[in-house]
Amino acid sequence: MTDLPFTLDQLRILRAILIQGSFKKAATSLYISQPAVSSHVHNIEKQLNIQLFDRSHRNAQLTEAGQLLLKYGGRILALCEETCRALEDLQNLQCGNLIIGASQTTGTYLMPKLIGLFRQKYPQISVQLQVHSTRRISWSVANGQLDLAIIGGEVPKELTEILEVRNFVEDELTLILPPSHPFSKFSCIQKEDLYRLRFIALDKNSTIRKVIDKILNRNGIDSSRLKTEMELSSIEAIKNAVQSGLGASFVSISAIDKELKLQLLNRVNIDKIKIKRMLSIITNYSRYRSKASETFCHEILGLLVNLPFKNAPSTEK
């Protein structure tokens, strides 16, 4: 085969369809028309003489051939993107882009502070932050769409051999109450008192919820007996609900600095129980690590917690 039956732009279109779930959304994300997307897909299928999408479904569903093409096409695109970034680093070590991922709470309350420190010292480096679930962020690092990420949960089991995971710092979770609650006058309550509270919590599948339930159960507190009155989708919503007197909750200490200073919320300890989770830095063993990424890890993360960030093992023999 002398001429390739597809271009890099066409591979980008196929990847966008897979990520966005439809031709229309893919077109919007790429700033092109939907007919243009359909035309490119039709041309590839014509060149390959094979169907890439199952059109009997409402959403864009890849056929087996489409999945195979995207498997290798994704690698091609990632390698091209790495090549461009490597050349950019070679041209100017202090220039470039840094794309960081973070899970919800970490991305909302911790990362802006760290990125602020980094930008003060390296204002010429562009930093992008993407905040999603731990699972989605882990896959983005594995696919080369992120340079690194900081997460508060475990990476998917299928990615453990692909991702390098290094513990960063402990994040303490604390019980919060409205100032009007009777327990707010105490600095510490007994674990049995938790059964008397009404709780506002994140979804059961959230990382923080799983950590809290696991630690409470380990300390003799049956999390299934806690009265969960309401489940909300964000920490901000939970804080507002607690401030309004609707119940109590567990949140990261990093999320309530302002509320504690303004006395909008009270933090109450539980006797002999500390609820902590480990935040981890994840990178991809096999991906090129940009100068900006190494600088962020060494000078920002390493500086804050005295953690020297190690490079991935060499593949040279």
UniProtKB/Swiss-Prot annotation:
- Main localization of the protein? plastid
Query: What Pfam families does the record tag this protein with?
Result: HTH_1, LysR_substrate
Residue ranges occupied by any HTH lysR-type domain in the UniProt entry: 6-63
Q: Which InterPro entries match?
A: LysR_subst-bd, Tscrpt_reg_HTH_LysR, WH-like_DNA-bd_sf, WH_DNA-bd_sf
Subcellular localization is given as: Plastid, Chloroplast
- Could you state a single Gene Ontology molecular function term? DNA-binding transcription factor activity
Q: Name one GO cellular component term.
A: chloroplast
DNA-binding region range list = 23-42
Coiled-coil-forming residues are none
Q: Does the keyword Lipid biosynthesis apply?
A: no
Q: Which UniProt keywords apply?
A: Chloroplast, DNA-binding, Plastid, Transcription, Transcription regulation
**Family classification:** Belongs to the LysR transcriptional regulatory family.
* Role this protein plays: Trans-acting transcriptional regulator of RuBisCO genes (rbcL and rbcS) expression.
Protein name, UniProt field: Probable RuBisCO transcriptional regulator
Q: Which gene encodes it?
A: rbcR
